[in-house]
Structures are given as structure tokens and as C-alpha cells.
Amino acid sequence: YWLWGASPKVSAITIVNRCTILKPLFHVCSKHNILISELSKHEEIYEEIAAQYKGKRRIAGLQELVALSKDIGFTILDEDSLRKFSKYLVVNDSNQTPYIPPRIWAYQLERLETCIDDFLSISDGVISVFNSFMDNHNQTNENRKFINEQFNKYNVSVMLQKWTNFDPDTAKMPNFSKYLSMVSFASIAYIVNFSLMRISEAYLLRYGCFSKTLIDGQEIFLIHGVTSKTEKGEASWVVSPSVEKAIKALEIICELRFSCAKKIFGIKQDITDYKPYLHIPVFEPWGSGRGENERLEHIRSTIPYNNQISTFDKIFDPKELQITQVDFNIACKMTPNLDTEIYQVGKAWHFAWHQLRRTGAVNMLASGLITEQSLQYQLKHANTIMSLYYANNYYKLKFK
């Protein structure tokens, strides 16, 4: 079939790789005098077969067997068998993304939410300050008195001091832009925590991506975007109701910066028609690192989570991120190949965007409230076996 089937144009190395994937199945079946077409009925040899596989990429390749069943005329492993087989797999992959210990994960989530809530509490003032700066930036960019008057008038100064290293004695307009960028980062991080989307997918979210719908009388909250991991580019993620405020914060900042971009690029459309990326670059004329030389449709480069924490160093308290012995034990249990040079008791947890995705996957399955199929949908995986790899060891985590 691989030579003369629907897609005959394959290289020799591709054929070799595919045969390598199948070899353990045939070898163990032959050893036990079991027809390969009867493999689904013999779970007792799954563990022996699984022991011969290393790394998730070859394992994930088994999912092709399901799709080929009708074409080749028989089934080697069906969907249910793949799910059972995956439970015997021992992940031997030094690149397994670390699982964030619950205490640290909950702390970062709480701080992100507080940052967003604080911003929304002064959002009217933020809009007023932004518009005032737009009207007067040519004359007042270095007028510290005017800048502080605006910050104080609209109660923005308190939040700048709480969340950034703002000093009224050295107040500048770029301080304001940095605060907006920080809130934008916090909102994106909050969304990723609850949606499990890839950070690249979060960066592609556009204005107006959030919606609510009623299903069987229950209100469901959705984020609409794009993904490259499914046949259809368009995708939706089910999210917590609390994600709405993160979207709201992003929309406010997007509206302000888009108003500047319209003048720079001569855009005639309203924001609701244009639908720019929510995580929009800095376009305000006084902003540090403003995006005038960027195209509005340019997809921003992903900045590592830990780098963002260093840039916006008042979001998290380093002491709260220090790994305790309990944190370390949980991290090692969930990720046996954890890099203990990076993750040690007493050191601050080193964050990465993909950790939010894996941690969420583990927590969802461990809760017992989410099915494997629902997790697969949320992660935008082609098969449940891939999702189970993400949630590896979830059964070791107990929620009360």
C-alpha cells in the first residue's frame, strides 16, 4: 500500500522509517503466534511491544494505522487499542516538558489574574491618559509635571508603582507603554493557562475572537483562532469564564494601539472590521520599541516566558517561585527526567510557555472531570495518543 496506494510518491527512507515503526508489532506477534490483525484482542502483549519503542515521534506514528485500516483491508490497532497501548509506554525522552508543581502554578495564575483585575479597575483612566498623551506628546514628552498630573488625575500612578519600577521623580511617557505591554503579556499568559493553546496560537488571536454560546442550556465560553495542527486551519478552544477579562484587557490595549497604527499606515477600517492581532506591537509615538517599522500584520516573535518575567520583574515575587522540597518531589514524580541542574530546591522555578500546556493537560486528566477525547480537542492533537503523552503520569497526581 505504501508503494502503490493513494500516496505512492514516498522516498526510500520514509519506507524504512515506517517499517521500523511496524517491526516491534510484527516481531512480538510472531513470537506469540498471534495474527497482526488480531493484535487488538491481545492486550497482554502490549507491554512487551511498548518496551521496544523509544521517543514519542515513533509512537505517534502508530496513529497512521487507524487511518489506513479501511484502505489496507484490516485493522492492526484501532482507536481504543491505541489508547490502551499508550498506557504501557515508558516515556524515555529527556525533552519531556516539566510539569509545574501545583503551588507554583497556582501562584503564577493568581498573580496574572490580579494584574489583569487591577488594570481593568483603572481602564477608564488608562484610556484617558493615553488619549491625553496622544493630544500632547509633541510638547510634553519630557514634561514630568504634566505626566505625573495625568497619572495622578486618573489614578494610574498607584498601579504603575505597584506593577512596575515607576518613579514619579523620573516619570516618562514610555513608563506607561511598558505597563500596557506588561498587562498584554499577563493576559496572554492567563489565556494560555486556561486554553492550553500553543503560545504561537495565542499570538495569532485577533480582535473579536471571544464568544459565548448556549449548549443544552449551559453557557459555553469560546476563543476562536487558527492552528496548524489540524486539517482545518480554524480552531476553537473552550475556556473558563474568567478568561473573558483577559480578553477584555487585551482588547482595550489593542484599541489604543490600533488607533495609532491607523494614523501610521493610513488604515480606513474600524478595528471591528480590520480585526488586528490582539497582542499588538507598540505603536504609540512615545513608546519604547514602537512598531512603526513593523507591519501591522507582522506576526510577533515569541519571547520566552522566563524572559518576560525578567522584563516585568514585579509580576512575581522571586521568593514565592523558589522550589521547596515538596515542589521538587512532585516535579520529579511527574517528570522523571527533570533537569536537576536547572530545577533544584531553593532555586526559582524556570518557566517556559509549553509548561503551561503540559501542566494544564496533566491537571485536567488528573481531575477526573475531563475525558481523553476532550483533552485531545483542547490540545488540537490528531490522536489521543499524542495527548496522553502530554499528560504522562497524570494518574500519580491526586486532587481532593
Regions found by a protein language model. Give the residues of each.
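Non-catalytic DNA-binding core/recognition domains of DNA-processing enzymes
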Residues: 3-84, 101, 181-186, 192-195, ...
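Extended accessory and catalytic-adjacent subdomains in large enzymes
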Residues: 81-400
